[in-house]
Amino acid sequence: MLLKSIQNIVCGLVPTFFLFGSAAAELDFEQWHPAGLGDLRCGCPAMNSLANHGFINHNGSNITVNEVIPLMQEVFHLSEELATIVTGLAVLSADDPASGIFNLDMLNRHNIFEHDASLTRKDFYLGGDGHTIDQPTLDEFLSYFDGKEWIDLNDAAAARYARVLDSREKNPSFLYQDQQLITSYGETIKYFRTMVDPRSNKTSAEFVRILFTEERLPVREGWQRPREEISGFSLASDVVQLALRTPEKFIGMPFDQRPFAEQAFDPLPWQRPPIWTPPNYPGFSKRHFSELVGRFAKKALPFRA
């Protein structure tokens, strides 16, 4: 349903994007100015970096689908299909998605583009606003790369999952179902792949630090546009690899369903069986059954997320 909404909105807007042409030769990465008073920003460092470099309106307002899609292709080497999906998710946060126009601060609306367990922002419940970098959160995220010149997918997985655990512990309204889970995995893969060295399949820790702290593309330090196109298929494949490096047993599962061992054993949401309702025996309630199975699951599972 979500992808269908994106398709319906964006397909009517993208024909004119071909008029944009190839912008790579015209983009001046040396031009960079951080957000000033009154400038609008969101929780996505990639989007914010486009504004800080002046590739989209520096004030963060009146951004169009027709300009963002080709920029995603030219700057980050996303495929047309993936650039359209990412931009479509952004425009869904707009007051009028069908217009194809949005402001960056609209992306801060909770649980559309923005989500709990951000890599650098506080959860809304904990006082976050979606766009302001929270220094303790940023420090925790970057601490997983301390002392390393290069980071691999294991490092990226550990840093991401630490944020999930932290939010789960501190935020009683923490929401981490399939939409938030896929968004969380996807954003980690996107920064990892756009900064990766194809020879080693590792990413410069310095590039990641600059992107997340300054919201700047680290061209001065040697970053270049990825050589290989990042497609929806390659993103999905990398998401699976990231998931396999993450000790989540209840990934994407609503908390009230987690006592059931049948679902607890499934590591990924697309491998989950349908929700099973236990038999209704007189004097033996669903709560009793849940407690019984929960005790069994605790003994049967060596660890649980």
UniProtKB/Swiss-Prot annotation:
GO biological process: sterigmatocystin biosynthetic process
EC number(s) from the headed UniProt entry: 1.11.1.-
Keywords of the record: Heme, Iron, Manganese, Metal-binding, Oxidoreductase, Peroxidase, Signal, Virulence
Keyword Isomerase: no
Induction: The genes forming the sterigmatocystin biosynthesis cluster are co-regulated and induced on oatmeal porridge or the fungal isolates were grown either on oatmeal porridge or in YEC medium (0.2% yeast extract, 5.0% corn steep liquor). Expression is positively regulated by the cluster-specific transcription factor aflR that binds the palindromic sequence 5'-TCG(N5)CGA-3'found in the promoter.
A GO term for molecular function: metal ion binding
Alphabetized Pfam families for the sequence: Peroxidase_2
Major enzyme class: oxidoreductase
Free-text cofactor note: Binds 1 heme b (iron(II)-protoporphyrin IX) group per subunit. Binds 1 Mn(2+) ion per subunit.
InterPro entries: Chloroperoxidase, Chloroperoxidase-like_sf
Binding site for Mn(2+): E114, H115, S118
Pathway(s) this gene product operates in, as recorded in its UniProt entry: Mycotoxin biosynthesis; sterigmatocystin biosynthesis
Residues binding heme, per UniProt: C44
Annotated signal sequence range: 1-25
Requisite cofactors: heme b; Mn(2+)
Family from the record: Belongs to the chloroperoxidase family.
Summary of the function given for this chain in its UniProt record: Peroxidase; part of the gene cluster that mediates the biosynthesis of sterigmatocystin (ST), a polyketide-derived furanocoumarin which is part of the most toxic and carcinogenic compounds among the known mycotoxins. The first step in the biosynthesis of sterigmatocystin is the production of hexanoate by the fatty acid synthase (FAS) units stcJ and stcK. The polyketide backbone is assembled by the non-reducing polyketide synthase stcA by condensation of the starter hexanoyl-CoA and 7 malonyl-CoA extender units followed by cyclization and release of norsolorinic acid.
Protein name: Peroxidase stcC
Species assigned in the record: Emericella nidulans (strain FGSC A4 / ATCC 38163 / CBS 112.46 / NRRL 194 / M139) (Aspergillus nidulans)
